[in-house]
From Swiss-Prot:
Residues 38-55, 104-137, 251-278, 358-372, 483-505, 568-600 are extracellular. Pfam families: Na_sulph_symp. The keyword Ribosomal protein does not apply. The lineage of its organism: Eukaryota, Metazoa, Chordata, Craniata, Vertebrata. Glycans are attached at N584, N594. It comes from the Eukaryota. Residues 1-16, 77-82, 159-229, 300-336, 394-422, 444-461, 527-546 are cytoplasmic. It comes from Mus musculus. This is Na(+)/dicarboxylate cotransporter 3. The chain crosses the membrane at residues 17-37, 56-76, 83-103, 138-158, 230-250, 279-299, 337-357, 373-393, 462-482, 506-526, 547-567.
Length: 600
């Protein structure tokens, strides 16, 4: 028995190597079960899917496999594979990451967060709302992981003032954890990017969370404090995941949708920064509202009894202390600097230009140029380029005439060294791997083959299809990276839409947004893992809270797709650009020639 246990431990320690060696052998029958080229492409895709789900290789390294396997297996020449890693979609995402680096470099996000918390008040339910609103807003522009890691130390400082040091002694992961490498100094420093966290998770060394602390069960006040603490911690990663869906640059799956749309449907131009924001921002607000109500009621921050009950002096004093802490931290930032003002103006310009380039409901500024020449990537790169030469100190004309003034070079708002350190370049490779995979599916004919296998689903009502897709993907992404999940599912959803003869976006958007709705497990997303690693949450806390969050997300997404999304993306018709793809890729039955479809 001891020998068997020892052998099991050795197998577990070598599990990644075993997956690397055995999975390619296990998938070999696929090469003989399908037509040659389609079979080879499916072999590569399934191999990458298993490697992504098991993290046998780092995610970004797995994303590079098409560069090796597609040419060797005769699927795509290298000249067609490599450009997929630097499409204009990748540069749009890169520009967003660089802008986020500048915001974090000058602590602009921290100033915004503290100011919002000062405005919402210090009652627990209001603070939870403030945390969720602030985190979601930051997550629209920063990475979800960075937003979470920045807000958790702020929440910790507030909770220390509310409940004292005894309950706050394990408020953050242990010093030295890579997932919180930049939570330094006064406990309120932010993690600049998700790069360190992803690196640690890809390496396979995820620290076990400490056991939650023991608190006396005989005290209702202690139970109230424990629940408030959990409510704070759990609301931050959830709102980060929700907020990331509101903009195209907010999370990688949104940009993967844009890139794969251009691959499968080159004539599709309905999705851009502006149209996506008009669709996703109201959905984000609705989800934040119902999520806040659910978390507040579940963890005691808000209840009918608390509204009627007079506040105790202890709680009133604690709230006053929390308010003082927030104000003190805000004052410690000092007066707003010239660099902060400059970054804020450039950030606003960045967002406004992206939104107004081609908002669809009115002509955008891109109409002043030749059609198709100016994309969102052009806008993003143009703005972030300014960061590398615009001075961080206020320029002065007197300097030119004062010959005694020091002749030191003015530092720019962002240095390239800082950008190199903080931008998660691995995500760029991951995006490229998804686009290369989509290109391989199209060129090899695998997309057409998948479409043929989906023939039995042609009679599924589209509304039911949306619900099923969102549920399946939301469940799948609880156990796998949301980026890997959407890379795998989007080609299938595109072909399913052709078979159902519905607008492709009617299925592809729910799949994309749904893969961000991962709330039930610590391993589902890096933000969940960071919150769980504080040691104050149990898995059952996340399952209990996240189950209803997932359900609410699915229902709200279905509501959005069948109401305002119909108008924004013209989902009630089967577009010509999809019809062209259908004619080239799959032979639709004669009965499916009507150009209008009812989606609900």
């Amino acid at each position: 028995m001891a020998a068997l246990a020892a052998l099991a431990k050795k197998v577990w320690s070598a599990r990644r190597l075993l997956v690397l060696l055995l999975v390619p052998l296990a998938l070999l029958p696929i090469l003989f079960a399908l037509p040659p080229k389609e079979g080879r492409c499916l072999y590569v895709i399934l191999l990458m899917a298993v490697y992504w789900c098991t993290e046998a290789l780092p995610l970004s390294v797995t994303a590079l496999l098409p560069i090796i396997l597609f040419p060797f297996m005769g699927i795509l020449p290298s000249s067609k594979v490599c450009p997929q890693y630097f499409l204009d979609t990748n540069f749009l995402f890169l520009s967003g990451l660089i802008m986020a680096s500048a915001i974090e470099e000058w602590n602009l996000h921290r100033r915004i967060a503290l100011k919002v918390l000062m405005l919402v008040g210090v009652q627990p339910a209001r603070l939870i709302l403030g945390m969720m609103v602030t985190t979601s807003f930051l997550s629209m522009w920063l990475s979800n992981t960075a937003s979470t890691a920045m807000m958790l130390p702020i929440a910790s400082a507030i909770l220390k003032s509310l409940f004292g040091q005894r309950e706050a002694r394990k408020d953050l992961p242990r010093e030295g954890d890579e997932s919180t490498a930049a939570v330094q100094g006064n406990g309120l420093r932010t993690v600049p990017t998700e790069m360190q966290f992803l690196a640690s998770s890809e390496g396979g060394h995820t620290e076990d969370a400490e056991a939650p602390m023991e608190l006396p069960d005989d005290s209702k006040e202690e139970e109230h404090r424990r629940n408030i603490w959990k409510g704070f911690l759990i609301s931050i990663p959830y709102s980060a995941s929700i907020g990331g869906t509101a903009t195209l640059t907010g999370t990688a799956p949104n940009l993967i949708l844009l890139g794969q749309l251009k691959s499968f449907f080159p004539q599709c131009d309905v999705v851009n920064f502006g149209s996506w924001f008009i669709f996703a921002f109201p959905l984000m607000l609705l989800f934040l509202l119902v999520g806040w109500l659910w978390i507040s009621f579940l963890y005691g921050g808000m209840s009918w009894r608390s509204w009627r009950k007079k506040k105790s002096k202890i709680r009133a004093d604690a709230e006053d202390q929390a308010k003082a802490v927030i104000q003190e931290e805000f004052q410690n930032l000092g007066p707003i600097k010239f660099a902060e003002q400059a970054v804020f103006i450039l950030f606003c310009t960045f967002a406004i230009l992206l939104f107004s380039r081609d908002p669809k409901f009115i002509p955008g500024w891109a109409s002043l140029f030749a059609p198709g020449f100016v994309s969102d990537a052009v806008t993003g790169v143009a703005i972030v380029t300014i960061l590398f030469f615009f001075p961080s100190q206020k320029p002065s004309l007197k300097w030119w005439f004062d010959f005694k003034a020091p002749n030191s070079e003015t530092e720019p708002l962002l240095s390239w060294k800082k950008a190199q350190e903080t931008v998660p370049w691995n995500i760029i490779l991951l995006l490229g791997g998804g686009f290369a995979m989509a290109k391989g599916c199209e060129e090899s004919g695998l997309s057409a083959w998948i479409g043929g296998q989906l023939h039995p689903l042609e009679h599924v009502p589209p509304l039911l299809a949306v619900l099923l897709i969102t549920v399946v993907i939301a469940f799948f992404t609880e156990f796998a990276s949301n980026t890997a999940t959407i890379i795998i599912f989007l080609p299938v959803l595109a072909e399913l839409a052709i078979r159902l003869h519905v607008h492709p976006l009617y299925l592809m958007i729910p799949g994309t947004v749904g893969c961000s709705y991962a709330f039930m497990l610590p391993v589902s997303t890096p933000p969940n893992s960071i919150a769980f690693s504080t040691g104050h949450l149990l898995v059952k806390d996340m399952v209990r809270t996240g189950l209803l969050m997932n359900l609410m997300g699915v229902l709200l997404l279905s509501l959005a797709m069948n109401t305002w999304a119909q108008t924004i993306f013209q989902l009630g018709t089967f577009p010509d650009w999809a019809n062209t793809h259908a004619a080239n890729a799959t032979a639709l039955p004669p009965a499916l020639t009507n150009n209008t479809v009812q989606t609900f």
